[in-house]
């Protein structure tokens, strides 16, 4: 009498197949994770250096990868653009120092000006400078730091959250058409002011001297909304203009308020 065939070879084959599937799945997940955090240099103008933050840096070139722990440093006339795998874009103005951590999704602005464009639905990106951090999952804006004198953050479209890194619960939302101006060692966030989006789009070198942003239509939509409100007299932006290395905000055409006539006592 013949004994039934053993099931051991079949089970062993099935086990091998399962192991191969698991290894392939793990490889795919690791590849996707690397893609999500991969950042490359896509534009270089004049002097731009890249490398580990605490080591000698090399001249950056288009196509180079930016890794966690790296820093990028632009010269007096230098500019650069970085592109993430999810189409997040960061542009750096002259005399700007930025370091990267958390798989490059957290950036620290030590000095200078940077534009950020974070597509809607992208993984959250954070920018730290001084006592302030800015985070968003969908917005286009500009942030500038000048030594210990000031920090400026303005939003062209979308919404960003600004918060203090040394005080829990101290945060506010900055919407499109708003600008936050404060000091690097601030202990309480001021209310944001308004600015003219169209004027910034015309004067900012981080926009004017680069190809159009992917969020261009969203910004134009915000411009149109502003124009309608300004025509109705319900929206009065601050008289700010963008000059210099990227976002040097300066008052222009400043007109003093008319003096009020002294009131006359009529005896009533």
Language-model features: locations:
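Hydrophobic residues on conserved beta-strands that form the core of alpha/beta folds
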Residues: 41, 109, 136-138, 174
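C-terminal interaction modules
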Residues: 2-5, 9-14, 19, 28-36, ...
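Short, small-residue-rich packing micro-motifs
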Residues: 44, 72-134, 153-162
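N-terminal post-signal-peptidase region of extra-cytosolic proteins
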Residues: 52-69, 73-78, 93-94, 138
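Short, solvent-exposed loop/turn positions at domain surfaces
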Residues: 54, 60, 66-68, 86, ...
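Extended lipid/amphipathic-ligand handling interfaces
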Residues: 97-102, 138-142, 184
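Short N-terminal segments immediately surrounding and downstream of signal-peptide cleavage
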Residues: 34-51
């Amino acid at each position: 009498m013949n004994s039934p065939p053993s099931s051991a070879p079949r089970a062993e084959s099935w086990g091998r197949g399962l192991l191969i599937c698991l290894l392939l799945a793990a490889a795919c997940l690791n590849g996707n994770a690397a893609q999500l955090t991969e950042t490359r240099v896509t534009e270089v103008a004049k002097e731009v250096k890249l490398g580990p933050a605490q080591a000698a840096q090399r001249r950056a070139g288009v196509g180079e990868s930016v890794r966690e722990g790296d820093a990028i440093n632009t010269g007096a006339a230098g500019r650069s653009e970085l592109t993430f795998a999810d189409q997040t874009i960061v542009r750096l103005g002259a005399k700007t120092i930025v370091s990267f951590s958390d798989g490059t999704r957290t950036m620290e602005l030590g000095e200078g000006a940077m534009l950020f464009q974070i597509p809607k639905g992208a993984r959250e990106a954070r920018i730290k400078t001084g006592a302030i951090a800015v985070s968003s999952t969908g917005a286009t804006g500009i942030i500038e730091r000048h030594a210990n004198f000031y920090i400026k953050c303005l939003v062209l479209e979308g919404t960003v959250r600004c918060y203090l890194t040394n005080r829990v619960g101290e945060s506010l939302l900055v919407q499109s058409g708003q600008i936050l101006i404060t000091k690097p060692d601030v202990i309480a966030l001021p209310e944001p002011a308004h600015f003219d989006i169209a004027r910034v789009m015309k004067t900012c070198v981080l926009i004017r001297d680069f190809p159009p942003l992917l969020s261009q239509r969203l910004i134009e939509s915000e411009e149109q909304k502003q124009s309608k409100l300004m025509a109705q007299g319900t929206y009065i932006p601050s008289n700010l203009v963008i000059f210099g290395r990227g976002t040097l905000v300066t008052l222009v055409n400043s007109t003093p308020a008319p003096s009020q006539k002294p009131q006359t006592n009529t005896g009533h």
